[in-house]
C-alpha cells in the first residue's frame, strides 16, 4: 500500500488473537503502519503494534489464560459449543455473584509488557477509545496527548468490559469499555489523514460510528469462522485464531484466493473456463424441456446452489471464479481444515483420496430416495452418490430423474459431487 496506512482494531475480548495473525500478514507484505487505533482488546493489541513488539504479542496470546485476565479459570472445552456455553455461564455467574469481575491481573499483564515511552516515541500515531461511566461519553485520545504514566490506566479503561468487568477509575473519573461509544474507531484513525485503512473487525457487540470518507479506501478483514466467546481466554484457541487472522488477511490482500478456505493464486483457473459450460450442459441434460416445470426446477436449483456457494464461500470468490467457491463447498462437506493452504494438486489429491474410502451405491436400486437420504447423515456419502450418478449418466448419455431430486434435497452434497465431476478428467486412475 502506498502512502500513509492506518490500522484499525475493533474490540472483541478473547478473540483478539485474530488481530495478531493479521499483523503477521502485514509484516510479511512489509506494509508500514503509520496510524493504529483500537478499542478494548484492539487498543491493547494496537499498543503492541505501535511498540513494534510482534514477538511479545504472539507470546502473550500463545500463553494466555483466563487467570491472567481476571484471576478466574472457568471450565469447559473451548473447541465445542457446549464447552463455550459452560464458560460463558461460569463467567456470567461470577460477574453476577461478585457484582462485576475484578480485572487486576490484566493490569499486571499490561504493565509487564507495555513500554509507554517507546509507544509514544515510535513515530506511529496510536489512538484508543473509552467511555466515561455512568455518563457514557466518548473518550478518544492519542498516546502523545497524555502523560506516559497514564497510558496503562487509559488502556485498562478502554478494556473494562462492563458489566462483566468493573468500571475502571482513576483521577476521579470512572470508565468502561470503549465499545460503548466507538467499537471500531475508523473515524479516529481518519483524523490523522491516512491514504488507506485496514480495519480488523472481531464482530463483537458495540456502537459503530458512521464513516463518510469515500476518498480513503478501507480493506475489511473479518472471519467467517466462530472466533469464540468474548471472555474466553485460552492459549490453544488463541493460536487457532492467530492462524485464522493470518489466512484471512492473506486472502484480503490477494495473496491467496477463497472465501473461507485458502488456495494458492491461480488454483482451478482452467476449471473456471469450463464451469459455466458444464453447468449449462447438465441443466440441459436433466431438464431439457422448455415448459414451466423444467424451467421452475432449473431456477430453484440455481437459487439453492447460489445460496450454498455464498454461505460456504463469498461473493467476491463467486464472481471471480465460481469453481473455487464450489471447491470450498467440497472442502466443507469433506471436513477439510480451513487452517491449511491448498494448491490445486494437493486439494484434488486429498479430495479423491477421501472419495475413494467411501461406500458406493447404485442409485437405480434405491427405491424411495427421500427416505434413503433421511437415513444418511454423512454428506460425504451423498456427494459420492451424486458424483457417481453424473459419471454414469455421462457415459450412458442418459437422464436420471433421481439426480435432480438429490440436488434439490442435498444441495451441499450436490455441489461437492459436481466439483468432483468437474475434476474427473484429471483422475484417470480413480474407480
Region locations from a protein language model:
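Patatin-like phospholipase
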Residues: 1-39, 47-431
Amino acid at each position: 500500500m502506498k502512502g500513509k496506512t492506518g490500522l484499525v482494531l475493533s474490540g472483541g475480548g478473547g478473540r483478539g488473537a485474530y488481530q495478531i495473525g493479521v499483523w503477521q500478514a502485514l509484516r510479511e507484505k512489509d506494509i508500514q503502519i503509520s496510524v493504529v487505533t483500537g478499542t478494548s482488546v484492539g487498543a491493547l493489541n494496537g499498543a503492541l503494534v505501535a511498540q513494534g513488539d510482534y514477538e511479545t504479542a504472539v507470546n502473550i496470546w500463545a500463553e494466555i489464560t483466563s487467570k491472567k485476565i481476571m484471576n478466574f479459570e472457568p471450565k469447559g472445552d473451548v473447541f465445542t459449543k457446549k464447552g463455550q456455553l459452560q464458560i460463558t455461564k461460569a463467567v456470567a455467574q461470577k460477574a453476577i455473584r461478585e457484582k462485576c469481575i475484578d480485572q487486576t491481573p490484566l493490569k499486571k499483564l499490561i504493565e509487564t509488557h507495555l513500554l509507554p515511552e517507546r509507544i509514544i516515541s515510535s513515530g506511529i500515531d496510536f489512538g484508543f477509545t473509552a467511555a466515561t461511566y455512568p455518563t457514557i461519553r466518548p473518550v478518544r485520545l492519542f498516546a502523545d496527548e497524555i502523560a506516559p504514566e497514564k497510558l496503562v490506566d487509559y488502556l485498562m479503561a478502554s478494556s473494562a468490559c462492563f458489566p462483566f468487568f468493573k468500571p475502571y477509575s482513576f483521577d476521579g473519573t470512572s470508565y468502561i469499555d470503549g465499545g460503548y461509544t466507538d467499537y471500531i474507531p475508523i473515524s479516529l484513525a481518519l483524523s490523522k489523514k491516512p491514504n488507506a485503512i485496514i480495519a480488523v473487525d472481531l464482530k463483537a457487540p458495540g456502537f459503530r460510528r458512521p464513516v463518510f470518507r469515500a476518498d480513503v479506501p478501507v480493506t475489511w478483514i473479518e472471519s467467517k469462522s466462530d472466533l469464540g466467546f468474548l471472555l474466553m481466554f485460552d492459549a490453544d484457541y488463541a493460536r487457532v485464531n492467530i492462524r485464522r487472522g493470518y489466512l484471512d488477511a492473506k486472502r484480503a490482500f490477494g495473496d491467496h484466493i477463497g472465501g473461507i478456505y485458502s488456495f494458492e493464486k491461480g488454483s482451478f483457473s482452467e476449471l473456471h473456463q469450463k464451469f459455466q459450460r458444464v453447468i449449462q450442459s447438465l441443466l440441459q441434460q436433466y431438464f431439457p424441456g422448455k415448459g414451466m416445470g423444467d424451467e421452475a426446477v432449473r431456477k430453484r436449483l440455481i437459487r439453492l446452489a447460489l445460496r450454498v456457494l455464498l454461505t460456504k464461500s463469498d461473493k467476491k470468490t463467486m464472481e471471480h471464479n465460481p469453481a473455487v467457491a464450489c471447491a470450498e463447498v467440497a472442502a466443507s462437506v469433506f471436513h477439510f481444515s480451513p487452517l491449511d493452504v491448498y494448491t490445486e494438486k494437493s486439494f484434488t489429491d486429498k479430495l479423491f483420496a477421501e472419495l475413494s474410502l467411501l461406500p458406493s451405491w447404485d442409485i437405480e436400486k434405491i427405491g424411495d430416495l427421500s427416505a434413503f437420504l433421511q437415513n444418511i447423515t454423512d454428506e460425504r456419502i451423498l456427494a459420492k452418490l451424486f458424483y457417481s450418478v453424473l459419471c454414469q449418466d455421462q457415459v450412458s448419455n442418459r437422464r436420471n430423474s433421481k439426480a435432480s431430486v438429490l440436488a434439490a434435497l442435498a444441495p451441499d452434497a450436490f455441489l461437492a459431487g459436481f466439483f468432483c465431476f468437474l475434476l474427473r478428467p484429471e483422475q484417470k486412475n480413480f474407480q
